Amino acid sequence: MAVTKKIISQYDVKLVTKWAPPEGDDLRPLIAMPNIPKPTHGLAPRTLLGATTWNRMRKYAYAKADDTCEICGAKPENLRHRHGHEVYSIDYEKGTVTFQRVFCVCALCHLGCIHTGRAITLFRQGNPLYPKEFLLEGAEHAFKIINEYNKDHPGADLRVYRTFLDYLKCDDLREDMERLIEKYQVKFYEEDSKKMAKWGDWKLAIGSKEYPTPYENEKAWKEAMEKQGEKDTARLLQKNMEEKFSGGVYDELNAILNEPVENLNKKGIDISNNE
């Protein structure tokens, strides 16, 4: 459910036409990355590139980061609590989502701060893994990181993606979220809908390859989500995408993709399992 204009009007929400990851070593801004535009749902690199390639990429990201969250600096005792997530740049006017790389992120930053759209949906469905306490913990975690980043970088004006405003539409969350927004003086941003590319123009770019939206329109997207959910839809799309763009190697991807497994093992990067 989209954020209502009435809710948006009560807060400082900046309209943007692009989003790009930070260029320096400070990766805290990744906590504010936007949700993937609906037309490109189901086009996850982990699906399109296959399990072997995806596992190699994320294992490399874990090793490079020393199993430490590249956003908040946490190093989970249980390595199953560190995840791999995609970094994208998004051009809303051109309708292009460009895959950049995979980075190491802790479970709280990943599930409670980045995947906010999924979090609010599962909370509404009563999923026991997404209770009220977890959503609020994720929100406050994100707000703290953004405040600290702005203090360290005067004039940065890093903002929270507008999905957190959806929390205000839940009776069980509204009062606590209003308190957190006031406490941290949170500012938001969202896509400028008036300048958005048409639905059929959206695509996901991986290197020189472009994967077009698999949905004819928003109605088709809704039907697909209702029938199987995004994960199942992605699986069904995989064969079709491989047929459209078969052959060749994604040369522009991280050089790690072409490095022999034995070299990775020597560096302590084990890609033999799915941890």
Language-model regions, residue ranges each:
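Histidine-centered nuclease catalytic patch
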Residues: 50, 55-58, 70-104, 113-125
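Active-site/pore-lining binding-face segments in mid-to-C-terminal subdomains
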Residues: 94-156
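Sequence/structural segment immediately N-terminal to covalent heme-attachment motifs in c-type
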Residues: 59-65
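A boundary/linker detector
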Residues: 1-57, 74-78, 132-275
